[in-house]
Amino acid sequence: MPISKIHARSVYDSRGNPTVEVDVVTETGLHRAIVPSGASTGLHEVVELRDGDKTKWGGKGVLNAVKNVNDVIGPALIKENIDVKDQAKVDEFLNKLDGTPNKGKLGANAILGVSLAVAKAAAAEKGVPLYAHISDLAGTKKPFVLPVPFQNVLNGGSHAGGRLAFQEFMIVPDTAPTFSEGLRQGAEVYQELKALAKKKYGQSAGNVGDEGGVAPDIQTAEEALDLITEAIEQAGYTGQIKIAMDVASSEFYKEDAKKYDLDFKNPESDPTKWLTYEQLADLYKSLAAKYPIVSIEDPFAEDDWEAWSYFYKTSDFQIVGDDLTVTNPLRIKKAIELKSCNALLLKVNQIGTLTESIQAAKDSYADGWGVMVSHRSGETEDVTIADIAVGLRAGQIKTGAPARSERLAKLNQILRIEEELGANAVYAGEKFRTAVNL
């Protein structure tokens, strides 16, 4: 079925920054996708095209990316007349049209919007939900797997004030019998945590960060973990709900010294207290011994390969590469060869097309890795990643706290999918790392 119209516009993300929305029109109607954007972005990600005109939106406008869709990509793709169901061919065409290795000419934000909207058009043409179409594209088996929602309930690092260096503390309801029960448990713990934070740190501690987590003025990881442990206990889920962290350590790596500064938000930080990667690894291990930590993301800086391999050899929980791998096939291949981590954080806007995202997941699965599908800190009401998580059988999704509509949009979409699939779906639960084999 041919595409009759492709139109892009500039809309706003959850941080009030412009982002790209794309409409693809076929005989089945209008199919729309909105592209997200990240706050802490990896060096090796594809290029998110921003206008750089400081007189508008502080230079963050996306009018050039929008223009590239409307004037270049749209007309060319319509003329090419590729079947929307042939996602690989569509994405290959988009990449060739751009012609750069990092999508820097047309912008990954322009290309991704088109890629995702085309997938929605294809699902409509087949008369199936988006997750089922993605499952077909990826060749995943049945039954469908509903992911464990990793809920970012406490924020630090670049996402919050306070001195806390680690960026995200997540609760992981992996012993719940179903997705909806897991989400309920998470929501209940979140409410307890919010009340506790206000009681201990004052009313403003209930204020939420970019991803819906609370951001009290916490100094250390232990303090954060104690607070979360107490909230889990008060909600009645001790021993049932686990914890995951996204350290985002590239943000506090001192490259010249090859050390990590846990006091990086303090301009007067004391260099004698900076940690070597071995010391930081020991800190993680001591935390994992004391708290029910099942997953650590970006424990080391994105190019500190030696540290990753050292840590991988000596720990048994999930080690997730985000800044390390940036959903990039070459970086994933290197991480597999160097035995750096054992799970991929999949962000579609780091690689820029649906086909390449599916391939990144397949490459990771092939080496026995887990795959966690992820939102970005600048999100929208678009719920495509919920369908991607289910379609790929990823078994884990990270999409913020059970707060703020742009986060809940994804979680609510999975609730709908759960209801629709009924007995034809299983909850990944404690097998979230190997859900693709369920």
UniProtKB/Swiss-Prot annotation:
- Active site residues according to the UniProt entry: 211 (proton donor), 347 (proton acceptor)
Q: Which reaction does it catalyse?
A: (2R)-2-phosphoglycerate = phosphoenolpyruvate + H2O
EC number(s): the record gives: 4.2.1.11
Going by the UniProt record, its keywords in alphabetical order are:
Cytoplasm, Glycolysis, Lyase, Magnesium, Metal-binding
- Alphabetical list of InterPro entries matching this protein: Enolase, Enolase-like_C_sf, Enolase-like_N, Enolase_C, Enolase_CS, Enolase_N
Query: What family does the database annotate?
Result: Belongs to the enolase family.
What is this protein's name? Answer: Enolase
User: What species does this protein belong to?
Assistant: Penicillium chrysogenum
Gene it is expressed from? enoA
